[in-house]
């Protein structure tokens, strides 16, 4: 017969649970656990982390804290992968940057301590002399910019406008400090030889445009002729009977204001008998307008970025062409010069030709130089009494006010226009000097400047007109510190150097990274159309070889 067996009850007078571990469970490891815990968690995010160690174990739970029941996967070679842990190489200007900075700071501190120690040991008169020497040294460094800035960004070397070949010989070298000292006063009054073309009248409604009444810039499809000197039929005709130096206003303005230039440029010089012709290369970037060229930190974007120097130059040229035509009364009455435009064919529509007039002028530079220049006007303007004034129309464009220490035109143009023009003079000194020289050579009464900005900072295809400003070329030249005597002195110096050369073709090249211009002698056939075709064929062959 079954009977009830009373179990053994362990009495624990001091707490709960059994008093001792049974024999069968004595050597078995134990870990506090919860039925809600997963076995072998990849990462345990349940444990709270406390910054203060006083609360590390006070509110934490022991459940899930051990790894006795965790599942570990055995080594599986199929899931093995190589990981590239090589350190990326730093660029040259970043390498040891902080170490050099600390070294420079430590050196400056030691130098100051040494100066202070020397001052303490010197007598009173010697102290005054030492302080005066230090003051003059700081003044010199401030004036001439001999200050070492360890955090200053390194400027990358700029490319030359044309590749200098090994068979080119340097005939002359002129540095900018030398050219800035040139002066020439024996310049005769200009004489008009021939005037060609037709001009449209300026629309004075553009003078009333403000930042609050901005006007969109329209794309106007008109033909602009940028004919070089030797391709000009009028200059060819005049060269048979008069003159011994021939050029265009853009080429002469480049030479006359060259001491302000930063980027590389080049001009072809042809010595034919006793005559001198200044030309530009075909398919060159000579006519592109630079942007922020003379800024402390000019744009340095590369590739297809719309803020790269070349794309900014193309954008500025596009804006300048469109604004110079949009601000005129297009399709209405024109001011006609005695002779027609020499570059327009008979079957071309006159409305498709840009408003431009050419004035061929003659200067006497001493007794031996007879200079003939083709100058340009962009428009004509009538005064209060009906008098006619010829004007040159140019455009300043804002691409991003956050760069080159710029100011926001939409905020400052109406109230602080002086600050805007001062900033532009600092960032585009060379371009403004070229425009001023062109206006002075052409004899224009006024120089019209348009202020055009992007519709959006990151959109280089749409622009708006924010305002205009008018200057007299002579007054503007003095305002931007452009010395006319120095400009003529530089030109006379270049002409004298080229006149001493033998017959042939030469190249005036601005060094891309130095304040120097050099005169190279070129072999026969350089920059000819046949040579350009051969270069293009070689480039195509190289591209085909790379593709294959």
Swiss-Prot record:
It comes from the Eukaryota. It is found in: Cytoplasm. Its main location: cytoplasm. Residues 285-299 are annotated as: RNA gate. GO terms for biological process: cap-dependent translational initiation; formation of cytoplasmic translation initiation complex; IRES-dependent viral translational initiation; positive regulation of translation; translational initiation; viral translational termination-reinitiation. The keyword Magnesium does not apply. The keyword Acetylation applies. Residues 523-548 are annotated as: Disordered. The modification Phosphoserine is found at residues 161, 528-529. Residues 529-548 have a biased composition (Acidic residues). One of its GO terms (molecular function) is mRNA cap binding. Pfam families: eIF-3_zeta. The modification N6-acetyllysine is found at residue 53. Keywords: Acetylation, Cytoplasm, Initiation factor, Phosphoprotein, Protein biosynthesis, RNA-binding. One of its GO terms (cellular component) is eukaryotic 48S preinitiation complex. Belongs to the eIF-3 subunit D family. mRNA cap-binding component of the eukaryotic translation initiation factor 3 (eIF-3) complex, a complex required for several steps in the initiation of protein synthesis of a specialized repertoire of mRNAs. The eIF-3 complex associates with the 40S ribosome and facilitates the recruitment of eIF-1, eIF-1A, eIF-2:GTP:methionyl-tRNAi and eIF-5 to form the 43S pre-initiation complex (43S PIC). The eIF-3 complex stimulates mRNA recruitment to the 43S PIC and scanning of the mRNA for AUG recognition. HAMAP family: eIF3d. The RNA gate region regulates mRNA cap recognition to prevent promiscuous mRNA-binding before assembly of eif3d into the full eukaryotic translation initiation factor 3 (eIF-3) complex. Component of the eukaryotic translation initiation factor 3 (eIF-3) complex, which is composed of 13 subunits: EIF3A, EIF3B, EIF3C, EIF3D, EIF3E, EIF3F, EIF3G, EIF3H, EIF3I, EIF3J, EIF3K, EIF3L and EIF3M. The eIF-3 complex appears to include 3 stable modules: module A is composed of EIF3A, EIF3B, EIF3G and EIF3I; module B is composed of EIF3F, EIF3H, and EIF3M; and module C is composed of EIF3C, EIF3D, EIF3E, EIF3K and EIF3L. EIF3C of module C binds EIF3B of module A and EIF3H of module B, thereby linking the three modules. EIF3J is a labile subunit that binds to the eIF-3 complex via EIF3B. This is Eukaryotic translation initiation factor 3 subunit D. It comes from Rattus norvegicus (Rat). The lineage of its organism: Eukaryota, Metazoa, Chordata, Craniata, Vertebrata. The gene is Eif3d.
